[in-house]
């Protein structure tokens, strides 16, 4: 029973999807953890990348499809940032507005059809299959892993640059950044554009991975990415930027593995949203639970020391 549940196939699928969805978690890491902005346009931006990638891939250019998806994500991030920085809209409302508008835009990109298929179309995975034939069935994981490694390395390098440090400072204290003659509106715009590009890239990669696109493919993506982010930070900590980025990828893969195991237990598809909600709730409450357990341990330790001291005094 356990062998069938924790099989190599389950692990492989979880790692493949984990690396693909880790790009969304990395996008949320930049907007939520670094910039301290709750960007709720993630769901629509993910679907936008998926739809744009499908349309471009149908022309026979799967690599260009990923670039086009990223460009579309940049546009989405720019609009979100423009609403916040220029029109004074709150970050949550700006995300909701963009996400609502993207639903119609995504439908238009998909030709006002709710689904698209790439079954008879070349993808980055099918193109690389011949070159990576020595990996056997693991070639998809190699591509997804290469993408997240490149994105993670680029993110780590960028956040160490002057502009990257300015973005990090904006999330910590925008007033201090403004006093340093740095325009926080510019840093927020750059950060959200990069976040949108990563989110749309994830959608484009998923479209080519599963050879299809659905108008509802991005539903709940922000909660899934947030769960991955918190799982990684809880288990690996956030002492250094490198550890935090690795934690994002690890959390995403672990989340997909939990979902894959749930499916192996024959959990109905209709109940998967409930499973996802439970995982998210546990992930979000983990820091508070750890803090409470640590407090109880310290309290019991102090009680034992007082008892020991009292006995020695007698």
Where are these regions (language model features)?
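Transmembrane alpha-helical segments in multi-pass inner-membrane proteins
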Residues: 199, 203-274
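Membrane-embedded helix boundary and interhelical linker motif in transport proteins
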Residues: 32-87, 128-134, 239-240, 264
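Membrane-interfacial amphipathic/re-entrant helices at transmembrane-helix boundaries
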Residues: 1-24, 52, 58-64, 129-141
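Cytosolic-side transmembrane-helix boundaries in multi-pass membrane proteins
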Residues: 6, 154, 172-179, 183-186, ...
């Amino acid at each position: 029973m356990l062998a069938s549940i924790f099989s190599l196939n389950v692990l492989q699928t979880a790692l493949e999807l984990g690396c693909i969805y880790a790009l969304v978690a990395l996008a949320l890491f930049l907007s939520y953890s670094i910039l301290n902005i709750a960007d709720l346009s993630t769901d629509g931006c993910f679907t936008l990348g998926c739809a744009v990638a499908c349309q471009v891939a149908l022309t026979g250019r799967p690599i260009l499809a990923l670039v086009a998806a990223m460009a579309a994500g940049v546009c989405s991030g720019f609009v979100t940032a423009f609403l916040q920085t220029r029109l004074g809209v709150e970050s949550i409302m700006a995300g909701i507005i963009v996400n609502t508008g993207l639903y119609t835009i995504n439908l238009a990109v998909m030709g006002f059809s709710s689904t698209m298929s790439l079954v008879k179309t070349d993808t980055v995975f099918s193109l690389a299959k011949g070159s990576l034939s020595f990996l056997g069935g693991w070639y998809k994981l190699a591509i997804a892993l290469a993408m997240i490694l490149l994105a993670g390395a680029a993110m780590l390098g960028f956040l160490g640059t002057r502009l990257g440090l300015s973005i990090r400072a904006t999330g910590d204290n925008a007033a201090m950044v403004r006093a340093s003659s740095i325009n926080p509106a510019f840093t927020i715009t750059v950060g959200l554009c990069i976040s949108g590009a990563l989110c749309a890239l994830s959608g484009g990669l998923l479209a080519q991975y599963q050879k299809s696109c659905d108008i509802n493919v991005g539903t709940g993506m922000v909660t899934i990415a947030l769960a991955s982010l918190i799982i990684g930070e809880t288990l690996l900590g956030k002492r250094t930027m490198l550890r935090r980025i690795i934690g994002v990828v690890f959390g995403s893969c672990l989340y997909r593995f939990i979902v894959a195991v749930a499916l192996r237990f024959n959990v109905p598809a209709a109940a998967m949203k409930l499973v996802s909600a439970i995982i998210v709730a546990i992930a979000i409450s983990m820091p508070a639970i750890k803090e409470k357990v640590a407090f109880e341990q310290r309290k019991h330790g102090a009680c034992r020391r007082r008892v020991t001291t009292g006995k020695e005094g007698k």
